[in-house]
UniProtKB/Swiss-Prot annotation:
ATP binds at residue 255. The lineage of its organism: Bacteria, Bacillati, Bacillota, Bacilli, Bacillales. PANTHER family: GLUTAMATE--TRNA LIGASE, GLUTAMATE--TRNA LIGASE, MITOCHONDRIAL-RELATED. It is an enzyme of class 6 (ligase). Its main location: cytoplasm. A motif ('HIGH' region) lies at residues 11-21. The keyword Ligase applies. This is Glutamate--tRNA ligase.
């Protein structure tokens, strides 16, 4: 009988949930759910100095926000716990002591200065820097001397000589590493905390992880973890290393790259929809059959096939994300769109936090004008700018429109019609524009464009009668007067 699929997402709380981490979590989630397997969250917090306050909370909160749930983890428990590495130190200790007893690991007393000098010497000689094994075979006298000096040892794994480590990667196919390319690596730091490679291998085995899906940057860790599996006589899981995510310059997405918004909480703050972000991330390095790009979470689960993970880097296209979020925005009811947009108008000082019923209805109507156009909630501030300014700034295209010979005649006639209106509503404004057409003989662009540019400052925008109705008679007449003088 085949083992039940068990996969894990194992973030370090050294930062908040970003696009790359979210993709790793999402592919593991889809892989597990597609095969009725288990999805586990494990917190790898052994790099204590780099852990940031709120890092773990951010990871869990925004995985949930994206629509993921898990079967075992720090917050839900499970029979393979604890699920936080700093709570598993006794487990690691028992195992690395076993390696020491069997001579498969040893204590290294070299200081940071000695290791750095060794490294610099290797680089100067054009060699690949790696630990040369100076403390691999210390005598008891040497150990006693180092102990007497008060040196604190790390523990290194004794890398086997002349060995090949091969595995069939889910994404890359056959991969081979040679043990001679690796120095003996540290498995326990001087502070007694195990290193990433040791703790991960131990946890993946004890938690019965069947598949390890992670980023390409981890591939050189795989042979080290395989050595640890081998030392204990454990079966290795199946590995899959997903390609990098690159920006539009084809450079690896870096957390320091400010041209791209990278943290999931930033997207929530900007008024993006979690379903759209889920959809977008699911297509970063994985593709379904066919041309369709918009899928629900359940559809992704049903069709997720790891064989379709891409071997090429995944391009992060910000414009594509905006387009995709817009597709989802169009499907939302107006209440949802208002809830995503209104806080941004408040934050920008456009409207008060404490709106009267009448003001709230007006703002709702303004937002409704841009429902189909809006890519994300915060965009309403820029889109609706004309409703909150006393004057309008004309674009070059708009200035050209206003140079037309017919413009003064059209605008004066429209001002007269508008002034006469008792009820300023889209329907009455349409009638007013028709009356101007009849009176002046101008129609089409020659009629509509001068009115649009003079009243809104834009050559393109929402339905003109609706926009004019929301701007109000007084503001529109002032703007027309400014143009015709």
């Amino acid at each position: 009988m085949e083992k039940q699929v068990r996969v894990r997402y194992a973030p370090s709380p050294t930062g908040h949930l970003h696009i790359g981490n979210a993709r790793t979590a999402l592919f593991n989630y889809l892989f597990a759910r597609h095969q009725d397997g288990k999805f586990i969250i494990r917190i790898e917090d052994t790099d204590v100095k780099r852990n940031v306050a709120g890092g773990e909370e951010s990871q869990l909160k925004y995985l949930k926000w994206l629509g993921m749930d898990w079967d075992e983890g720090v917050d839900v428990g499970g029979k393979y716990g604890p699920y936080r590495q700093t709570e598993r130190l006794d487990i690691y200790k028992e195992l690395y002591e076993d390696l020491l007893e069997r001579g498969l690991a040893y204590k290294c007393y070299m200081t940071e200065e000695e290791l750095e000098a060794e490294r610099e010497g290797q680089i100067a000689r054009g060699e690949t820097p790696r630990y040369a094994g100076n403390h691999r075979n210390l005598t008891e006298e040497q150990i006693a001397q180092f102990e007497a000096e008060g040196r604190v040892p790390s523990i290194r794994f004794r890398v086997p000589d002349n060995r090949e480590y091969k595995f069939n990667d889910i994404v890359k196919g056959d991969v081979t590493f040679h043990s001679n390319d690796f120095g003996d690596f540290v498995i326990v730091k001087k502070d007694g905390i195990p290193t990433y490679n040791f703790a991960v291998a131990v946890d993946d085995h004890l938690m019965e992880i069947t598949h390890v899906l992670r980023g390409d940057d981890h591939i050189s860790n795989t042979p080290k973890q395989m050595m640890i599996y081998e030392a204990f006589g454990w079966d290795t899981p199946q590995f899959g290393h997903m390609t990098l995510i690159v920006n539009e310059s084809r450079k690896k997405l870096s957390k320091r790259d400010e041209s791209i918004i990278q943290f999931i909480e930033q997207y929530e703050a900007l008024g993006y929809l979690p379903e759209a972000i889920f959809n977008f991330i699911a297509l970063l390095g994985w593709s379904p059959v066919g041309e369709e790009e918009i899928f629900s979470k359940d559809e992704f689960i049903k069709m997720f096939d790891a064989a379709r993970l891409s071997k090429s880097p995944a391009l992060f296209d910000s414009q594509k994300l905006k387009w995709m979020n817009n597709q989802y925005m169009k499907k939302q009811d107006l209440d949802t769109v208002v809830a995503l947009s209104l806080p941004h108008l408040v934050k920008a000082g456009r409207v008060s936090e404490d709106l009267s019923e009448q003001e709230a209805a007006w703002v709702r109507d303004v937002i409704a004008l841009y429902h189909e156009q809006m890519s994300y909630g915060a965009e309403i501030v820029e889109l609706s700018e004309m409703f909150f300014k006393d004057h309008v700034d004309f674009e070059e295209e708009g200035k050209e429109v206003l140079k037309g010979e017919q413009v003064p005649e059209v605008l004066r006639a429209f001002a007269v019609e508008l002034e006469a209106l008792e009820e300023v509503e889209p329907a009455t404004i349409k009638k007013a524009i028709k009356a101007v057409q009849k009176e002046t003989g101008h129609k089409g662009k020659n009629l509509f464009m001068p009115i649009r540019v003079a009243t809104t400052g834009q050559t393109h925008g929402p339905e003109l009668p609706n926009a004019i109705a929301l701007l109000g008679k007084e503001k529109v007449l002032k703007r027309i007067q400014k143009v015709i003088g």
